[in-house]
From Swiss-Prot:
Mod. after translation: O-glycosylated; glycans contain N-acetylglucosamine and may play a role in fiber assembly and stabilization.
Location within or outside the cell: Virion; Host nucleus
Organism the protein comes from: Human adenovirus C serotype 5 (HAdV-5)
GO cellular component: host cell nucleus; viral capsid, fiber
Region feature (Disordered): 1-23
Additional record remark: All late proteins expressed from the major late promoter are produced by alternative splicing and alternative polyadenylation of the same gene giving rise to non-overlapping ORFs. A leader sequence is present in the N-terminus of all these mRNAs and is recognized by the viral shutoff protein to provide expression although conventional translation via ribosome scanning from the cap has been shut off in the host cell.
Region described as Spacer: spans on this chain: 393-398
Main localisation: virion
InterPro entries hit by this protein: Adeno_fibre, Adeno_fibre_knob, Adenobir_fibre_prot_rpt/shaft, Adenovirus_pIV-like_att, Attachment_protein_shaft_sf
Protein name as catalogued: Fiber protein
Renumbered residue ranges of the record's region Tail (penton base attachment): 1-44
Gene Ontology BP term (one): adhesion receptor-mediated virion attachment to host cell
Length: 581
Protein backbone atom coordinates (compact mmCIF):
# COMPACT_ATOMS: atom_id res chain seq x y z
CA UNK A 1 0.00 0.00 0.00
CA UNK A 2 1.44 3.35 -1.00
CA UNK A 3 1.10 6.11 1.63
CA UNK A 4 0.03 9.56 0.67
CA UNK A 5 2.25 12.57 1.33
CA UNK A 6 0.65 14.56 4.10
CA UNK A 7 -0.01 18.30 3.75
CA UNK A 8 2.38 20.46 5.74
CA UNK A 9 -0.56 22.39 7.20
CA UNK A 10 -2.34 19.21 8.38
CA UNK A 11 0.73 17.12 9.26
CA UNK A 12 -0.02 14.05 11.37
CA UNK A 13 3.11 12.18 12.41
CA UNK A 14 1.13 9.04 13.26
CA UNK A 15 1.55 6.23 10.77
CA UNK A 16 -0.21 5.22 8.57
CA UNK A 17 -1.00 8.64 7.14
CA UNK A 18 -4.47 9.51 5.98
CA UNK A 19 -5.05 10.68 2.49
CA UNK A 20 -6.16 14.22 1.92
CA UNK A 21 -9.47 13.23 0.34
CA UNK A 22 -10.07 9.59 1.07
CA UNK A 23 -11.58 7.96 4.12
CA UNK A 24 -9.34 7.16 7.11
CA UNK A 25 -7.30 3.98 7.02
CA UNK A 26 -8.96 1.07 8.72
CA UNK A 27 -8.09 -0.52 11.08
CA UNK A 28 -6.60 2.33 13.15
CA UNK A 29 -3.11 1.81 14.58
CA UNK A 30 -2.12 3.30 17.92
CA UNK A 31 1.52 4.42 17.67
CA UNK A 32 3.42 5.99 20.60
CA UNK A 33 3.02 9.51 19.06
CA UNK A 34 -0.30 11.19 19.62
CA UNK A 35 0.53 14.99 19.47
CA UNK A 36 2.27 17.04 16.78
CA UNK A 37 3.49 19.62 19.36
CA UNK A 38 7.29 19.77 19.20
CA UNK A 39 7.52 17.36 16.25
CA UNK A 40 7.82 17.72 12.54
CA UNK A 41 8.41 15.59 9.41
CA UNK A 42 11.68 16.84 8.08
CA UNK A 43 12.94 15.65 5.69
CA UNK A 44 9.81 13.96 4.29
CA UNK A 45 9.19 10.63 5.86
CA UNK A 46 11.51 11.36 8.81
CA UNK A 47 10.12 12.29 12.24
CA UNK A 48 12.23 15.00 13.94
CA UNK A 49 12.03 17.62 16.70
CA UNK A 50 10.92 21.20 15.98
CA UNK A 51 13.68 23.37 17.56
CA UNK A 52 14.16 27.12 18.22
CA UNK A 53 17.09 29.16 19.57
CA UNK A 54 19.03 28.49 21.82
CA UNK A 55 18.29 24.71 21.33
CA UNK A 56 20.30 22.86 18.65
CA UNK A 57 21.35 19.26 17.86
CA UNK A 58 25.00 18.32 18.15
CA UNK A 59 26.32 14.84 17.25
CA UNK A 60 22.73 13.54 17.21
CA UNK A 61 22.02 14.92 20.67
CA UNK A 62 19.96 17.91 21.86
CA UNK A 63 22.29 20.74 22.96
CA UNK A 64 22.09 24.36 24.29
CA UNK A 65 23.85 27.32 22.73
CA UNK A 66 25.78 29.31 25.37
CA UNK A 67 27.08 32.86 25.07
CA UNK A 68 29.92 34.63 26.89
CA UNK A 69 29.96 34.07 30.64
CA UNK A 70 27.91 30.82 30.58
CA UNK A 71 29.33 27.25 30.91
CA UNK A 72 28.57 23.77 32.23
CA UNK A 73 30.18 22.56 35.41
CA UNK A 74 31.37 18.98 35.95
CA UNK A 75 27.88 17.93 37.00
CA UNK A 76 26.43 19.32 33.78
CA UNK A 77 24.76 22.30 35.48
CA UNK A 78 24.51 25.66 33.70
CA UNK A 79 26.59 28.25 35.55
CA UNK A 80 27.56 31.92 35.12
CA UNK A 81 31.17 33.00 35.13
CA UNK A 82 30.28 36.71 36.03
CA UNK A 83 30.00 37.25 39.82
CA UNK A 84 28.06 40.39 40.93
CA UNK A 85 29.66 42.35 43.81
CA UNK A 86 27.85 44.98 45.89
CA UNK A 87 28.82 47.65 48.43
CA UNK A 88 26.90 48.84 51.50
CA UNK A 89 24.14 49.71 51.89
CA UNK A 90 23.49 46.98 49.24
CA UNK A 91 23.69 43.37 50.46
CA UNK A 92 23.85 40.20 48.27
CA UNK A 93 22.23 36.97 49.37
CA UNK A 94 22.13 33.67 47.50
CA UNK A 95 19.74 34.90 44.82
CA UNK A 96 18.82 38.50 45.72
CA UNK A 97 20.35 41.94 46.20
CA UNK A 98 18.87 43.80 49.20
CA UNK A 99 19.18 47.37 50.54
CA UNK A 100 20.18 47.62 54.20
CA UNK A 101 18.26 50.50 55.88
CA UNK A 102 17.96 52.04 59.33
CA UNK A 103 15.78 54.79 60.84
CA UNK A 104 14.56 57.18 59.63
CA UNK A 105 14.55 55.21 56.32
CA UNK A 106 11.82 52.57 55.95
CA UNK A 107 10.08 50.58 53.20
CA UNK A 108 6.40 51.34 52.72
CA UNK A 109 4.36 49.73 49.91
CA UNK A 110 7.62 48.34 48.37
CA UNK A 111 9.02 51.91 48.16
CA UNK A 112 11.86 53.48 50.13
CA UNK A 113 10.47 56.31 52.30
CA UNK A 114 11.61 58.57 55.13
CA UNK A 115 9.82 58.34 58.47
CA UNK A 116 9.33 61.93 59.68
CA UNK A 117 8.26 63.32 63.06
CA UNK A 118 7.31 66.91 63.89
CA UNK A 119 8.60 69.44 63.09
CA UNK A 120 9.77 67.45 60.01
CA UNK A 121 7.17 66.42 57.45
CA UNK A 122 6.96 65.20 53.85
CA UNK A 123 5.00 67.51 51.57
CA UNK A 124 4.95 67.36 47.77
CA UNK A 125 7.49 64.44 47.79
CA UNK A 126 9.91 66.76 49.62
CA UNK A 127 11.20 66.58 53.18
CA UNK A 128 10.42 69.92 54.78
CA UNK A 129 10.21 71.48 58.20
CA UNK A 130 7.18 73.08 59.81
CA UNK A 131 7.94 76.39 61.53
CA UNK A 132 6.08 78.74 63.85
CA UNK A 133 6.81 82.37 64.62
CA UNK A 134 9.39 83.64 65.36
CA UNK A 135 11.02 80.84 63.29
CA UNK A 136 10.68 81.26 59.54
CA UNK A 137 12.25 80.01 56.30
CA UNK A 138 13.99 82.67 54.23
CA UNK A 139 16.08 81.97 51.11
CA UNK A 140 15.76 78.20 51.86
CA UNK A 141 17.34 78.74 55.29
CA UNK A 142 15.83 78.50 58.75
CA UNK A 143 15.95 81.92 60.40
CA UNK A 144 14.39 83.92 63.21
CA UNK A 145 11.99 86.78 62.43
CA UNK A 146 12.85 89.73 64.66
CA UNK A 147 11.17 92.97 65.61
CA UNK A 148 12.77 95.91 67.40
CA UNK A 149 14.51 96.08 69.75
CA UNK A 150 15.64 92.53 68.75
CA UNK A 151 17.83 92.19 65.65
CA UNK A 152 20.37 89.84 64.05
CA UNK A 153 23.95 91.09 63.93
CA UNK A 154 26.86 89.02 62.52
CA UNK A 155 24.72 85.88 62.67
CA UNK A 156 23.81 86.39 66.34
CA UNK A 157 20.60 87.50 68.04
CA UNK A 158 21.22 90.98 69.45
CA UNK A 159 19.38 93.71 71.34
CA UNK A 160 19.26 97.28 70.02
CA UNK A 161 19.54 99.87 72.77
CA UNK A 162 19.37 103.62 73.18
CA UNK A 163 19.95 105.88 76.18
CA UNK A 164 19.60 105.45 79.06
CA UNK A 165 19.96 101.71 78.26
CA UNK A 166 23.44 100.53 77.20
CA UNK A 167 25.64 97.42 77.19
CA UNK A 168 28.90 97.10 79.15
CA UNK A 169 32.15 95.54 77.93
CA UNK A 170 30.97 92.28 79.48
CA UNK A 171 27.89 92.38 77.22
CA UNK A 172 25.62 93.14 80.18
CA UNK A 173 22.54 95.36 79.74
CA UNK A 174 22.66 98.28 82.16
CA UNK A 175 21.22 101.76 82.60
CA UNK A 176 23.08 105.04 82.85
CA UNK A 177 21.79 107.64 85.30
CA UNK A 178 22.34 111.33 86.01
CA UNK A 179 21.67 113.13 89.33
CA UNK A 180 19.37 112.94 91.18
CA UNK A 181 19.08 109.38 89.77
CA UNK A 182 21.75 106.89 90.95
CA UNK A 183 22.64 103.20 90.50
CA UNK A 184 25.21 103.05 93.31
CA UNK A 185 23.28 100.38 95.24
CA UNK A 186 22.84 98.13 92.20
CA UNK A 187 19.34 99.40 91.56
CA UNK A 188 17.87 102.62 90.19
CA UNK A 189 17.34 105.13 93.00
CA UNK A 190 17.04 108.86 93.77
CA UNK A 191 19.33 111.00 95.94
CA UNK A 192 17.04 112.90 98.33
CA UNK A 193 17.37 116.13 100.29
CA UNK A 194 14.98 117.76 102.78
CA UNK A 195 12.04 118.37 102.54
CA UNK A 196 11.77 115.36 100.18
CA UNK A 197 11.75 111.94 101.84
CA UNK A 198 10.67 108.33 101.12
CA UNK A 199 8.08 106.28 102.96
CA UNK A 200 7.00 102.76 102.02
CA UNK A 201 8.89 103.07 98.73
CA UNK A 202 7.11 106.32 97.80
CA UNK A 203 8.39 109.90 97.56
CA UNK A 204 6.90 112.34 100.04
CA UNK A 205 7.16 116.06 100.83
CA UNK A 206 7.38 117.52 104.31
CA UNK A 207 5.30 120.71 104.68
CA UNK A 208 3.91 123.09 107.28
CA UNK A 209 1.16 125.75 107.48
CA UNK A 210 -0.09 127.53 105.43
CA UNK A 211 0.88 124.71 103.02
CA UNK A 212 -1.33 121.63 102.96
CA UNK A 213 -2.22 118.74 100.62
CA UNK A 214 -5.74 118.49 99.25
CA UNK A 215 -7.58 115.27 100.01
CA UNK A 216 -9.19 114.89 96.60
CA UNK A 217 -6.29 115.69 94.25
CA UNK A 218 -3.27 115.08 96.51
CA UNK A 219 -2.02 118.49 95.41
CA UNK A 220 0.20 120.78 97.49
CA UNK A 221 -1.58 124.09 97.89
CA UNK A 222 -1.74 127.17 100.14
CA UNK A 223 -4.51 127.64 102.66
CA UNK A 224 -6.06 131.13 102.37
CA UNK A 225 -8.02 133.34 104.74
CA UNK A 226 -10.18 136.49 104.37
CA UNK A 227 -8.87 138.98 101.83
CA UNK A 228 -6.55 136.45 100.18
CA UNK A 229 -7.31 134.11 97.28
CA UNK A 230 -5.60 131.99 94.60
CA UNK A 231 -6.20 133.21 91.06
CA UNK A 232 -4.71 131.37 88.05
CA UNK A 233 -2.29 129.47 90.35
CA UNK A 234 -1.08 132.78 91.87
CA UNK A 235 -1.66 134.00 95.42
CA UNK A 236 -3.21 137.46 95.44
CA UNK A 237 -5.28 139.89 97.50
CA UNK A 238 -9.05 139.75 97.11
CA UNK A 239 -10.54 143.11 96.08
CA UNK A 240 -14.03 144.27 95.26
CA UNK A 241 -15.87 147.42 94.28
CA UNK A 242 -13.61 150.29 93.25
CA UNK A 243 -10.47 148.52 94.42
CA UNK A 244 -8.23 146.94 91.80
CA UNK A 245 -4.64 146.52 90.58
CA UNK A 246 -2.51 148.64 88.27
CA UNK A 247 -0.23 147.30 85.52
CA UNK A 248 2.58 146.73 88.06
CA UNK A 249 0.31 144.69 90.33
CA UNK A 250 -0.12 147.45 92.93
CA UNK A 251 -3.50 147.81 94.63
CA UNK A 252 -5.32 150.95 93.52
CA UNK A 253 -8.64 152.76 93.67
CA UNK A 254 -10.48 152.74 90.36
CA UNK A 255 -12.37 155.94 89.59
CA UNK A 256 -14.86 156.75 86.85
CA UNK A 257 -15.91 159.98 85.15
CA UNK A 258 -16.24 162.91 87.50
CA UNK A 259 -13.62 161.52 89.89
CA UNK A 260 -9.86 161.39 89.73
CA UNK A 261 -6.89 160.64 91.98
CA UNK A 262 -4.63 163.54 92.97
CA UNK A 263 -1.41 161.49 92.95
CA UNK A 264 0.66 164.32 94.45
CA UNK A 265 -1.56 164.82 97.48
CA UNK A 266 -2.85 161.23 97.39
CA UNK A 267 -6.53 162.21 97.55
CA UNK A 268 -9.76 161.58 95.68
CA UNK A 269 -11.26 164.71 94.09
CA UNK A 270 -14.22 165.56 91.85
CA UNK A 271 -13.14 166.02 88.26
CA UNK A 272 -15.61 167.71 85.90
CA UNK A 273 -15.54 169.36 82.52
CA UNK A 274 -17.96 171.48 80.56
CA UNK A 275 -20.91 171.76 80.74
CA UNK A 276 -20.32 171.08 84.45
CA UNK A 277 -18.90 173.55 86.94
CA UNK A 278 -17.52 172.37 90.31
CA UNK A 279 -15.90 175.46 91.77
CA UNK A 280 -17.86 175.21 95.00
CA UNK A 281 -20.64 172.83 94.07
CA UNK A 282 -21.59 170.84 91.01
CA UNK A 283 -23.56 172.95 88.49
CA UNK A 284 -24.68 172.45 84.85
CA UNK A 285 -23.76 175.10 82.35
CA UNK A 286 -26.44 175.63 79.68
CA UNK A 287 -25.83 177.28 76.35
CA UNK A 288 -28.04 178.06 73.37
CA UNK A 289 -30.16 175.14 72.18
CA UNK A 290 -33.19 173.09 73.13
CA UNK A 291 -31.99 172.40 76.72
CA UNK A 292 -33.12 174.66 79.61
CA UNK A 293 -33.82 174.58 83.37
CA UNK A 294 -37.55 174.79 83.93
CA UNK A 295 -39.34 176.42 86.82
CA UNK A 296 -39.12 173.23 88.84
CA UNK A 297 -35.32 173.36 88.47
CA UNK A 298 -35.37 170.29 86.16
CA UNK A 299 -33.45 169.99 82.92
CA UNK A 300 -35.95 170.28 80.08
CA UNK A 301 -35.94 170.40 76.25
CA UNK A 302 -37.66 172.58 73.70
CA UNK A 303 -38.96 170.81 70.52
CA UNK A 304 -40.74 171.84 67.31
CA UNK A 305 -42.59 170.26 64.33
CA UNK A 306 -41.86 166.61 63.58
CA UNK A 307 -41.16 165.87 67.23
CA UNK A 308 -43.41 165.30 70.21
CA UNK A 309 -43.10 164.30 73.85
CA UNK A 310 -44.40 160.79 74.41
CA UNK A 311 -45.65 159.79 77.87
CA UNK A 312 -44.97 156.14 78.67
CA UNK A 313 -47.07 153.90 80.90
CA UNK A 314 -44.81 154.67 83.86
CA UNK A 315 -45.38 158.41 83.26
CA UNK A 316 -41.86 158.83 81.89
CA UNK A 317 -41.38 161.26 79.03
CA UNK A 318 -39.69 160.39 75.74
CA UNK A 319 -38.95 162.61 72.76
CA UNK A 320 -40.08 160.85 69.58
CA UNK A 321 -40.35 161.60 65.88
CA UNK A 322 -43.86 162.39 64.79
CA UNK A 323 -44.29 160.61 61.42
CA UNK A 324 -47.23 159.58 59.20
CA UNK A 325 -47.29 155.83 58.52
CA UNK A 326 -49.94 156.44 55.85
CA UNK A 327 -47.31 158.18 53.71
CA UNK A 328 -44.90 155.20 53.45
CA UNK A 329 -42.81 155.83 56.56
CA UNK A 330 -42.35 153.50 59.53
CA UNK A 331 -40.12 152.72 62.47
CA UNK A 332 -37.66 149.85 61.97
CA UNK A 333 -36.49 149.14 65.52
CA UNK A 334 -35.18 152.61 66.51
CA UNK A 335 -34.71 154.05 63.01
CA UNK A 336 -37.03 155.77 60.54
CA UNK A 337 -37.51 153.51 57.51
CA UNK A 338 -39.45 153.36 54.27
CA UNK A 339 -42.43 151.01 54.38
CA UNK A 340 -41.85 149.17 51.07
CA UNK A 341 -44.97 147.57 49.59
CA UNK A 342 -45.46 144.98 46.86
CA UNK A 343 -43.11 145.44 43.92
CA UNK A 344 -40.47 147.23 46.01
CA UNK A 345 -37.56 145.81 47.98
CA UNK A 346 -34.19 146.81 49.37
CA UNK A 347 -31.24 145.56 47.39
CA UNK A 348 -27.79 144.54 48.52
CA UNK A 349 -25.74 147.59 49.56
CA UNK A 350 -23.25 148.82 46.98
CA UNK A 351 -21.30 150.74 49.62
CA UNK A 352 -21.05 150.59 53.43
CA UNK A 353 -24.20 151.74 55.29
CA UNK A 354 -26.29 151.81 52.08
CA UNK A 355 -29.26 149.65 51.15
CA UNK A 356 -31.01 151.18 48.14
CA UNK A 357 -34.71 150.85 47.43
CA UNK A 358 -35.34 149.08 44.15
CA UNK A 359 -38.12 147.53 42.12
CA UNK A 360 -38.74 143.85 42.75
CA UNK A 361 -39.09 141.96 39.47
CA UNK A 362 -40.40 138.49 38.64
CA UNK A 363 -40.53 136.26 35.58
CA UNK A 364 -40.49 138.01 32.23
CA UNK A 365 -38.73 141.15 33.44
CA UNK A 366 -35.09 142.18 33.84
CA UNK A 367 -32.84 145.24 34.06
CA UNK A 368 -30.84 146.29 31.01
CA UNK A 369 -27.33 147.77 30.99
CA UNK A 370 -28.83 151.23 31.72
CA UNK A 371 -30.58 149.86 34.87
CA UNK A 372 -33.95 150.27 33.16
CA UNK A 373 -36.66 147.62 33.63
CA UNK A 374 -37.37 145.82 30.33
CA UNK A 375 -39.16 142.60 29.28
CA UNK A 376 -36.99 139.48 29.38
CA UNK A 377 -37.25 137.85 25.94
CA UNK A 378 -36.93 134.12 25.30
CA UNK A 379 -36.22 132.18 22.14
CA UNK A 380 -38.16 133.52 19.16
CA UNK A 381 -39.04 136.89 20.73
CA UNK A 382 -37.37 140.22 19.96
CA UNK A 383 -38.01 143.95 19.73
CA UNK A 384 -38.94 145.48 16.40
CA UNK A 385 -37.84 148.91 15.19
CA UNK A 386 -40.61 150.59 17.26
CA UNK A 387 -39.54 148.83 20.47
CA UNK A 388 -42.54 146.49 20.49
CA UNK A 389 -42.20 142.77 21.24
CA UNK A 390 -42.55 140.64 18.14
CA UNK A 391 -42.40 136.94 17.25
CA UNK A 392 -40.08 135.74 14.50
CA UNK A 393 -38.25 138.94 13.74
CA UNK A 394 -36.44 138.19 10.50
CA UNK A 395 -33.67 140.61 11.45
CA UNK A 396 -33.08 138.84 14.78
CA UNK A 397 -34.49 135.35 14.25
CA UNK A 398 -33.44 133.09 17.11
CA UNK A 399 -35.84 130.40 15.87
CA UNK A 400 -33.86 129.61 12.71
CA UNK A 401 -30.33 128.25 12.22
CA UNK A 402 -29.30 128.19 8.58
CA UNK A 403 -26.68 128.47 5.85
CA UNK A 404 -28.71 131.26 4.08
CA UNK A 405 -30.83 130.35 1.03
CA UNK A 406 -28.13 130.93 -1.61
CA UNK A 407 -24.81 130.21 0.05
CA UNK A 408 -21.36 130.29 -1.46
CA UNK A 409 -19.48 126.96 -1.60
CA UNK A 410 -19.53 126.07 2.09
CA UNK A 411 -18.91 122.35 2.53
CA UNK A 412 -16.92 119.38 1.28
CA UNK A 413 -18.22 116.17 -0.22
CA UNK A 414 -14.88 114.94 -1.55
CA UNK A 415 -12.68 118.05 -1.43
CA UNK A 416 -12.59 121.40 0.39
CA UNK A 417 -15.58 123.62 -0.55
CA UNK A 418 -16.56 121.50 -3.54
CA UNK A 419 -20.31 121.94 -2.91
CA UNK A 420 -23.04 124.30 -1.69
CA UNK A 421 -25.15 122.92 1.18
CA UNK A 422 -28.49 124.57 1.95
CA UNK A 423 -29.65 123.54 5.42
CA UNK A 424 -32.37 125.32 7.44
CA UNK A 425 -33.38 124.31 11.01
CA UNK A 426 -36.49 126.07 12.39
CA UNK A 427 -37.63 125.45 15.97
CA UNK A 428 -41.33 124.70 16.31
CA UNK A 429 -41.83 123.98 20.00
CA UNK A 430 -40.41 120.51 20.71
CA UNK A 431 -39.95 119.76 16.98
CA UNK A 432 -37.36 120.98 14.52
CA UNK A 433 -38.55 121.56 10.94
CA UNK A 434 -35.62 121.18 8.54
CA UNK A 435 -34.95 121.62 4.80
CA UNK A 436 -31.85 120.32 3.00
CA UNK A 437 -30.41 120.32 -0.53
CA UNK A 438 -26.91 120.20 -2.01
CA UNK A 439 -25.19 121.36 -5.23
CA UNK A 440 -21.70 120.20 -6.29
CA UNK A 441 -19.57 122.94 -7.86
CA UNK A 442 -16.32 121.08 -8.60
CA UNK A 443 -14.57 117.73 -8.35
CA UNK A 444 -15.81 114.24 -9.24
CA UNK A 445 -19.47 115.26 -8.71
CA UNK A 446 -19.50 118.31 -11.01
CA UNK A 447 -20.08 116.49 -13.27
CA UNK A 448 -20.48 112.93 -11.92
CA UNK A 449 -17.62 110.84 -13.26
CA UNK A 450 -16.29 107.30 -13.21
CA UNK A 451 -18.01 104.87 -10.86
CA UNK A 452 -19.19 107.46 -8.33
CA UNK A 453 -22.58 106.36 -6.97
CA UNK A 454 -22.83 108.19 -3.63
CA UNK A 455 -22.11 111.39 -1.74
CA UNK A 456 -21.79 111.87 2.03
CA UNK A 457 -21.76 114.85 4.37
CA UNK A 458 -21.38 114.92 8.20
CA UNK A 459 -21.91 117.86 10.57
CA UNK A 460 -20.90 117.59 14.22
CA UNK A 461 -21.84 119.74 17.25
CA UNK A 462 -20.39 120.09 20.77
CA UNK A 463 -22.40 119.92 24.03
CA UNK A 464 -23.65 123.53 23.49
CA UNK A 465 -24.86 122.83 19.96
CA UNK A 466 -21.95 124.79 18.43
CA UNK A 467 -20.66 123.47 15.07
CA UNK A 468 -17.28 121.70 15.40
CA UNK A 469 -14.38 122.44 13.07
CA UNK A 470 -14.14 118.78 12.01
CA UNK A 471 -17.57 118.99 10.35
CA UNK A 472 -17.93 118.85 6.57
CA UNK A 473 -19.71 122.26 6.82
CA UNK A 474 -17.61 125.41 7.30
CA UNK A 475 -18.71 127.10 10.64
CA UNK A 476 -18.35 130.52 8.94
CA UNK A 477 -21.55 129.81 6.98
CA UNK A 478 -23.67 128.56 9.92
CA UNK A 479 -25.52 130.87 12.37
CA UNK A 480 -28.89 132.31 13.40
CA UNK A 481 -30.88 134.05 10.69
CA UNK A 482 -30.61 137.81 10.27
CA UNK A 483 -32.68 138.86 7.29
CA UNK A 484 -31.35 136.92 4.30
CA UNK A 485 -27.95 136.57 5.97
CA UNK A 486 -26.61 135.24 9.27
CA UNK A 487 -25.64 136.96 12.52
CA UNK A 488 -22.23 138.63 12.42
CA UNK A 489 -21.25 137.24 15.84
CA UNK A 490 -20.78 133.50 16.29
CA UNK A 491 -23.48 131.96 18.49
CA UNK A 492 -22.58 130.17 21.75
CA UNK A 493 -25.63 128.00 22.45
CA UNK A 494 -28.11 126.19 20.23
CA UNK A 495 -28.91 123.06 22.26
CA UNK A 496 -32.63 123.53 21.55
CA UNK A 497 -31.96 122.79 17.85
CA UNK A 498 -30.04 119.52 18.45
CA UNK A 499 -31.45 115.98 17.92
CA UNK A 500 -32.86 114.67 21.22
CA UNK A 501 -30.41 112.24 22.86
CA UNK A 502 -33.20 110.22 24.47
CA UNK A 503 -35.01 109.77 21.16
CA UNK A 504 -31.81 109.36 19.11
CA UNK A 505 -29.10 107.93 21.44
CA UNK A 506 -25.50 108.83 20.65
CA UNK A 507 -23.89 105.57 19.54
CA UNK A 508 -21.46 104.21 16.98
CA UNK A 509 -24.16 101.90 15.62
CA UNK A 510 -27.09 103.23 13.64
CA UNK A 511 -30.53 102.46 15.13
CA UNK A 512 -33.69 102.29 13.06
CA UNK A 513 -35.46 105.32 14.54
CA UNK A 514 -32.31 107.44 14.22
CA UNK A 515 -32.55 107.23 10.42
CA UNK A 516 -34.80 109.14 8.04
CA UNK A 517 -34.84 107.48 4.60
CA UNK A 518 -36.53 109.08 1.60
CA UNK A 519 -36.04 109.91 -2.08
CA UNK A 520 -34.97 113.12 -3.79
CA UNK A 521 -34.32 113.76 -7.47
CA UNK A 522 -31.18 114.69 -9.35
CA UNK A 523 -31.59 118.21 -10.73
CA UNK A 524 -35.32 117.94 -9.86
CA UNK A 525 -35.85 115.32 -12.61
CA UNK A 526 -38.43 112.73 -11.41
CA UNK A 527 -36.86 110.12 -13.70
CA UNK A 528 -33.57 110.36 -11.79
CA UNK A 529 -34.26 109.28 -8.19
CA UNK A 530 -31.60 109.48 -5.47
CA UNK A 531 -31.97 107.76 -2.07
CA UNK A 532 -31.41 110.17 0.84
CA UNK A 533 -30.55 108.77 4.31
CA UNK A 534 -30.39 111.21 7.25
CA UNK A 535 -28.84 109.80 10.45
CA UNK A 536 -29.29 111.63 13.78
CA UNK A 537 -26.57 111.26 16.48
CA UNK A 538 -25.14 108.18 14.77
CA UNK A 539 -21.85 109.24 13.21
CA UNK A 540 -18.79 107.08 13.71
CA UNK A 541 -15.74 108.96 15.03
CA UNK A 542 -12.17 107.65 15.05
CA UNK A 543 -9.57 108.35 17.75
CA UNK A 544 -8.12 111.38 15.90
CA UNK A 545 -11.55 113.04 15.45
CA UNK A 546 -12.88 115.40 18.13
CA UNK A 547 -15.84 113.61 19.79
CA UNK A 548 -19.22 115.22 19.19
CA UNK A 549 -22.19 115.55 21.54
CA UNK A 550 -24.70 115.74 18.65
CA UNK A 551 -24.44 115.03 14.94
CA UNK A 552 -26.29 114.77 11.62
CA UNK A 553 -25.13 112.89 8.55
CA UNK A 554 -26.55 113.02 5.03
CA UNK A 555 -25.98 110.24 2.46
CA UNK A 556 -27.17 110.39 -1.17
CA UNK A 557 -26.99 107.07 -3.08
CA UNK A 558 -27.96 106.06 -6.62
CA UNK A 559 -27.53 102.86 -8.63
CA UNK A 560 -26.02 102.29 -12.05
CA UNK A 561 -24.00 104.70 -14.13
CA UNK A 562 -26.89 106.55 -15.76
CA UNK A 563 -25.98 109.85 -14.07
CA UNK A 564 -22.43 110.14 -15.47
CA UNK A 565 -21.70 113.66 -16.76
CA UNK A 566 -24.68 115.04 -14.75
CA UNK A 567 -24.06 117.82 -12.20
CA UNK A 568 -24.84 116.49 -8.70
CA UNK A 569 -27.66 118.77 -7.53
CA UNK A 570 -30.55 117.45 -5.43
CA UNK A 571 -34.10 118.65 -5.00
CA UNK A 572 -34.98 120.12 -1.59
CA UNK A 573 -36.17 117.72 1.10
CA UNK A 574 -38.09 118.70 4.24
CA UNK A 575 -37.98 116.59 7.40
CA UNK A 576 -38.47 116.99 11.15
CA UNK A 577 -37.10 115.52 14.38
CA UNK A 578 -37.52 115.79 18.17
CA UNK A 579 -35.46 118.61 19.70
CA UNK A 580 -33.15 118.42 22.70
CA UNK A 581 -34.46 120.66 25.51
Amino acid sequence: MKRARPSEDTFNPVYPYDTETGPPTVPFLTPPFVSPNGFQESPPGVLSLRLSEPLVTSNGMLALKMGNGLSLDEAGNLTSQNVTTVSPPLKKTKSNINLEISAPLTVTSEALTVAAAAPLMVAGNTLTMQSQAPLTVHDSKLSIATQGPLTVSEGKLALQTSGPLTTTDSSTLTITASPPLTTATGSLGIDLKEPIYTQNGKLGLKYGAPLHVTDDLNTLTVATGPGVTINNTSLQTKVTGALGFDSQGNMQLNVAGGLRIDSQNRRLILDVSYPFDAQNQLNLRLGQGPLFINSAHNLDINYNKGLYLFTASNNSKKLEVNLSTAKGLMFDATAIAINAGDGLEFGSPNAPNTNPLKTKIGHGLEFDSNKAMVPKLGTGLSFDSTGAITVGNKNNDKLTLWTTPAPSPNCRLNAEKDAKLTLVLTKCGSQILATVSVLAVKGSLAPISGTVQSAHLIIRFDENGVLLNNSFLDPEYWNFRNGDLTEGTAYTNAVGFMPNLSAYPKSHGKTAKSNIVSQVYLNGDKTKPVTLTITLNGTQETGDTTPSAYSMSFSWDWSGHNYINEIFATSSYTFSYIAQE
